[in-house]
């Protein structure tokens, strides 16, 4: 992901400060992989004929699951994830096969009306579905409850990361600013960003 370098830096810091006795080396393999996102209600139909050794059915591969198999004869790590809010998969293949696999997916998708899209479109789709990026649509004044993530707070736990912040008087004030979504009267009208 785009956060891989930050995660690696945190892990390297922990090895030096928290676990200096561990005999461990960390190596980023991000550049060794090509990732192809196939999103939309027909993504199973597009990928199905290309995938070997992986059952793509809803029951066998639920949301947030991962499987290993082959796609177009190439070893793959297939993730059932979606950054767009639709049914989706992320196909991970060794980088050297990325273009060939992308072209095979695109060709197979022609019968289903496939359309390539970029990261800007992906961000619009995710925002339309209400998928937020913490730190982009939110700041330190937004609570998990404000953005529909209250379920993720471990209230049964004695302590958790962020508990003190949520207990600050400013975070519980009834007159604090609120994060809201807006809909236009005419759905064809697009609000400008900002």
Feature locations, PLM:
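Conserved, structured C-terminal
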Residues: 1-194
């Amino acid at each position: 992901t785009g956060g891989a370098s930050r995660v690696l830096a945190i892990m390297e810091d922990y090895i030096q400060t928290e676990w200096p006795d561990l005999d461990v080396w960390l190596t980023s393999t991000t550049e060794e992989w090509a990732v192809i996102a196939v999103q939309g209600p027909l993504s199973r139909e597009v990928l199905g004929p290309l995938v070997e050794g992986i059952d793509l059915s809803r029951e066998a591969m639920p949301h947030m699951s991962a499987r290993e198999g082959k796609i177009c004869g190439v070893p793959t790590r297939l993730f059932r994830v979606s950054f767009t809010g639709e049914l989706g998969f992320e196909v991970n293949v060794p980088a050297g096969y990325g273009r060939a696999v992308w072209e095979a997916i695109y060709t197979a998708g022609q019968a289903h009306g496939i359309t390539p899209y970029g990261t800007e479109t992906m961000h619009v789709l995710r925002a339309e579905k209400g998928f937020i990026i913490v730190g982009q649509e939110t700041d330190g004044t937004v609570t998990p409850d404000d953005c529909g993530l209250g379920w993720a707070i471990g209230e049964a736990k004695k302590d958790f990361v962020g508990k003190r912040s949520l207990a600050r008087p400013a975070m519980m004030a009834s007159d604090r600013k609120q994060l809201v979504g807006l809909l236009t009267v005419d759905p064809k009208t697009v609000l400008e960003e900002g």
